[in-house]
Amino acid sequence: MDIYPEIELSKAQHNAIEALRNKSFPAHQVTRSYYKQLPHMRVLNYEGDQLVGYMGLDYRVVRVGDEIYKVLGVSDFCVESTVQRQGIGTTMLSQLSEYASTKDVDFIILVSVLERFYLANGYQRLNSLSSWLRVHEHKNYGVAVEQLDDLYVKPIRGKTWAFGHIDWLGYMY
């Protein structure tokens, strides 16, 4: 597994990400290697020359109640269907946690419907009122305020996630 700054990706890497992403999220296919917004970094996991695991990463702050947290947000995490249930996703999450522990990150944060997978990998499920910039097809539609129940966080620096409204201070991953 390697982490690349977005700006350093090759055309071939973008093409491989687009193919895996679209195969993994058929209801959200697009003709680019990202869905809503370019992530700051890309995590690529290859077996030979085939991309078998991918996730986008965004580093920023969010506000929870009166607390400000530095978060590493995960977007579009996917593993090639032919190699799922072989530990690739779990290994990628473990390596991501190791990476984050060497950086100034309070929590890893993501949105997913895969509850058992993330709970088994040390994430906590949250149910909280959240606000974020609603973005679709390169256009913003204002600020959304909704209850989210498919949000997961993993503490990296021993902090406890505060109770309260989550302000994403931008778009949601």
Label every PLM stretch briefly.
Residues I3-C78:
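A conserved beta-strand-loop-helix scaffold within acyl/acetyltransferase catalytic domains
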Residues S24, Y99, F117:
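Short alpha-helical functional segments enriched in proximate histidine and acidic residues
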Residues G48-Q50, T82, P155-T160:
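Short loop segments at secondary-structure junctions
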Residues D58-Y59, M92-L96, S131-H138:
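Short acidic (Asp/Glu) patches
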Residues V79, R85-E98:
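Conserved acetyl-CoA-binding loop-helix of GNAT-fold acetyltransferases
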Residues T102-D106, S112-E137:
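Conserved active-site alpha-helix within GNAT-family acetyltransferase domains
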Residues L133-Y173:
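C-terminal "cap" of GNAT-fold acetyltransferases
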